[in-house]
């Protein structure tokens, strides 16, 4: 991935609920001297005094509040780790507090508490905000930008001057740690359901996570295998954000000229139409003066025009490109999906919410300021939360989306996904697959179509850290509860680092053309 660090952090926020209604131990454990296979991350900084600390009692109270309120609000806190394991983890964290705790260190402890449950939508960003403050103040970070190919962590940008560590190199060690050890440490502070989802977040902002895991460094040693097979090591110096982007601009790496956030509808000829919807939320231009991310009219006009073009073109095949799509809201994506089927449908086979005290208060406030359509998802959610007992987990009867007849498309539908098809993009792909609307091509998504999501948040009393929790559990239309991304019907590998052609798109179009030719060949004469 292109390493543009501040925008990349938005990718982490994009790993959010499929439908919007809507991490590390203390440094004094001397990990290098113990046999712990996943030693504690170093603190972002170690102040000489405790002027920038939380008192021991404040830290303990925040941790206790965190655990108590998560049990009240999280739709299923113990889904992946049972209560006994959580109890032991919280006891371990509390035992580390034997005096004032540096704020940066405590924020990492909060990350560790949240990441322990292995649910991506249960998280805090307190330590990430510390790291971003370091970057914005001119602090230096290790400029490693990476992409995964299978289990291999590959560089996708130049990280230093000279010819060592060229893009496409497979990293084998960072600071003496094997990649598996780096990932194991990262898992302690990054909320992720699966290793694939963990890696996708590391791709988005590895320099930030290295800063949190290793602490400030002037340089780190990186061992690698170059694309040609030669092994090497290099000391990669830390850089300011400005110097890092200047280095990348001075040494550009070829890549497909594609922006996944653009909205594109294009006739490719030979009966194939291409549709890249972009995010399922309003763009900056579409939000207007109100700044409303759910202002849907601009997106509606785009979709109306796109399907009018498709109808006029006489296309028999439609390719929907969801690669790199950060997701958004189902009300947007339904404008597309409803034109591809002649049957009512629901985006999930099950949708349950926990009506915790914070969630009930949040939705009571929303209901007071908004007149919800009782038949809409938001209206049904509001009613279910209001009627449920405090802390109760209740099913929401999802409204069925009705087919849209205007310029409906009844040809062959194909969807292209990758590991960065997040949130509602993964949900749309699962919906198209489960309802037999489309053939899914590409690579497995990192995000999950059966997931804990629809997040809300509360704030801790002393640190002020925002704690994000999932209030809902949704199951994909097929009913599968497997903890896995959307698996394509036709797997397609991404292109190699340094390739400017869109290899995956070319492969997809070749498969569509082959299918068209096969159908033409077998079509009986009239």
Where in this protein do the model-derived segments appear?
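Flexible, low-complexity junctional segments that flank or bridge functional domains
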Residues: 29-318, 324-353, 361-369, 444, ...
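Extended C-terminal subregions enriched in glycine
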Residues: 412-434, 439-447
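Alpha-helix-centered segments that form part of catalytic cores
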Residues: 376-411
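Low-complexity, serine/threonine/proline-enriched polar segments
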Residues: 353-390
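Bacterial N-terminal signal peptides
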Residues: 6-16
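Boundary at the C-terminal end of the N-terminal hydrophobic targeting segment
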Residues: 18-23
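Short, surface-exposed connector motifs at secondary-structure boundaries
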Residues: 315-319, 408-414
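Extended, charge-rich low-complexity interaction segments
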Residues: 379-393, 471-487
